[in-house]
């Protein structure tokens, strides 16, 4: 009977990296390449985003100035947030390509070094890559299903209800979308832009998910090292090795802090843009639903809500990891069995763990589920006010 070869954690990690690189490479932003620099595809994507912004401005002009319809502003701005998010992720990650590679390669080195040690280390790696892989696939399905439905809605309306409905809420200058040919060209442009936007946003999100979900991995391996350290301390017969292992624990905690600081440095602005534009998009989409101006609005509303809570959930993940790290150092470490000099090292590490780095939206608000709840309350209040206004 043939047995399937076991896939090592490092191989699964590299598989995740390849999938992310394919998505971001689709938009010319493969920052994992040591020789990365912006090239024609990168600039083409930026030009496409600029084209979308210009067409959105034109759409607002036509609606407000020519047709006298102020509601077109809300309709046109509903999906602008996604474009702003994509452009921000592209520019920020391209500008921080070296830091992106540093974090990515650090985690890969951890997989290579500790995957070969087996036992508890291998379990930590397998658990973490399983969580990461599940998150990536789950979010991919969200993108494919919801954005796919947004694209197919106009086809359904055209074939079944014989109505011409736009995929995205923007017009192209000098193109008459009321004709069959004009509507087809406009729909094709919408589909192309939303496809590129989906790939780009997904790839940008996955790098953040990869980095944040692997922060607890360092904490988990620290716990295994601490268990080995305690066992050696209780033997009381190899103090030089005890001191060496203690120094290793200090280095590991510094690595945890450095990975958090680097991730925050890269994504602080991205997270601010993500939260702010998602909230604006939610408000505009809710307005479209009340005005019955965009049949696919409920789908985009669901996508935006999932995005908001997923990103805030990442912040809570980091907060929980920090609390666990502090608890492990304080309760699991046999610091009282060490000489005074070594106890001071533990106290220093404990003091640092009490003021650990957390993810924020440009240092303006912590990224957490509590923040998501507060934003949801504000959006709910706006929805009730709009409902009363529209009667």
UniProtKB/Swiss-Prot annotation:
Signal sequence segment: none
Keywords attached to this entry: Cell membrane, Membrane, Olfaction, Receptor, Sensory transduction, Transducer, Transmembrane, Transmembrane helix
Major location category of this protein: membrane
Listed GO CC annotations: dendrite membrane; plasma membrane; sensory dendrite
Localization in the cell: Cell membrane
Extracellular side: 67-71, 162-164, 213-268, 319-391
Phenotype seen when the gene is deleted: Mutant males inappropriately court other males, whereas mutant females are less receptive to courting males.
Side of membrane Cytoplasmic, spans: 1-45, 93-140, 186-191, 290-297
InterPro entries: 7tm6_olfct_rcpt
Tissue and organ expression note: Expressed in antenna.
Bilayer topology: Multi-pass membrane protein
Residues spanning the membrane: 46-66, 72-92, 141-161, 165-185, 192-212, 269-289, 298-318
Pfam family, one: 7tm_6
GO term, biological process aspect, one: sensory perception of smell
Highest rank taxon of the organism: Eukaryota
Family: Belongs to the insect chemoreceptor superfamily. Heteromeric odorant receptor channel (TC 1.A.69) family. Or67d subfamily.
Summary of the function given for this chain in its UniProt record: Plays a role in detection and sensitivity to pheromones and signal transduction of the fatty-acid-derived male pheromone 11-cis vaccenyl acetate (cVA). Acts in concert with Snmp and lush to capture cVA molecules on the surface of Or67d expressing olfactory dendrites and facilitate their transfer to the odorant-receptor Orco complex. Necessary to mediate behavioral responses to cVA by regulating both male and female mating behavior. Activation of Or67d neurons by cVA inhibits courtship of other males, whereas in females their activation promotes receptivity to other males.
Note: The atypical heteromeric and topological design of the odorant receptors appears to be an insect-specific solution for odor recognition, making the OR/Orco complex an attractive target for the development of highly selective insect repellents to disrupt olfactory-mediated host-seeking behaviors of insect disease vectors. Odor-evoked OR currents are independent of known G-protein-coupled second messenger pathways.
The protein's assembly and partners: Interacts with Orco. Complexes exist early in the endomembrane system in olfactory sensory neurons (OSNs), coupling these complexes to the conserved ciliary trafficking pathway.
Name of this protein: Odorant receptor 67d
Taxonomic source organism: Drosophila melanogaster (Fruit fly)
Underlying gene: Or67d
